[in-house]
């Protein structure tokens, strides 16, 4: 697990945000393709064997599978950069740091201009606290010894 200073996490944010946006796009694409597949399957069931266009079904499956692979890659890229996706649907990420000799998370949500909050590892989004001078003076990005 990588530990970040606030400055390091902020510096990593543009790359991580790009990967997060890619993940959200590919998740949407895979869900859309799966929705079309589900509707077609339901239509076949409801009609007792309606005709379907096999090439269209193959194309939808390929689109879904390609999007799922791209989604997984984007999530892997976020992890490689050192961030942790906490909630993909709302674009919530954490970066680990140390504050007063304990592990805490620098917390960022898609749409926020900068990393401005932190929380304990078990507190989650609802436990977010603003980064203040006290936090800045007592946090560091070094792993515990």
Regions found by a protein language model. Give the residues of each.
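Long, hydrophobic N-terminal alpha-helical segment
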Residues: 1-43
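Amphipathic alpha-helical coiled-coil segments
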Residues: 16-33, 60, 64-67, 71-74, ...
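Heptad-repeat coiled-coil alpha-helices
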Residues: 32, 36-39, 43-46, 53, ...
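Alpha-helix boundary/capping detector
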Residues: 35-36, 42, 56, 104-105, ...
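A short, surface-exposed helix-loop junction/capping segment
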Residues: 48-60
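Glycine-rich, aromatic-bearing surface loops/beta-hairpins
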Residues: 65, 72-145
